[in-house]
Design a protein with these regions (language model features):
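Conserved N-terminal subdomain of the carbohydrate kinase-like
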Residues: 46-130
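Glycine-rich phosphate/adenosyl-contacting loop at the front of the ribokinase-like
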Residues: 1-71
Length: 130
């Protein structure tokens, strides 16, 4: 089994809304280590994910997504802290700009004391990202 550890967030793509006072948002599951876990699982590799994930709406969606992709979520720590958001906006030339909302968020608050005392015996590789 490959264990990936790190970011679990939503990329939120912001575009002009239907009026001058609105913005259209499209949120997608993201985070490099989370994406690695999903990609490995899709390739048939047994995979687990270790992070701290919120109990908020976004966090529940992250867990549901990982489970739907057959990624083991048993090592995930749950919390009331909010989910990290990465806002992506395009300028007039289509160049993206990024704003990260990470202050006090779940995946940034994993403490050493919350790590498992021992990894499952099946873990052969650990990937830690961003």
């Amino acid at each position: 089994m490959i264990l990936t550890c790190g970011d679990a967030l939503f990329d939120v793509f912001a575009t002009a809304g239907s009026s001058a006072s609105s913005i259209a948002l499209d949120a997608r599951v993201g985070g490099s280590p989370l994406n690695v876990a999903v990609a490995l699982s899709r390739l048939g590799q047994p995979t687990a994910f270790l992070s701290k994930v919120s109990n908020d709406h976004f966090g529940r969606k992250l867990i549901a997504y990982l489970e739907s992709e057959r990624v083991d979520v048993d090592l995930i720590v749950r919390t009331a802290a909010p989910t990290t958001l990465a806002i992506v906006a395009l300028d007039d030339k289509g160049v993206p700009t990024y704003s990260f909302y990470t202050n006090g968020t779940a995946d940034r608050s994993l403490a050493v004391s919350e790590l498992p005392a021992r990894l499952p015996d099946a873990v052969r590789v650990v990937h830690i990202g961003s």
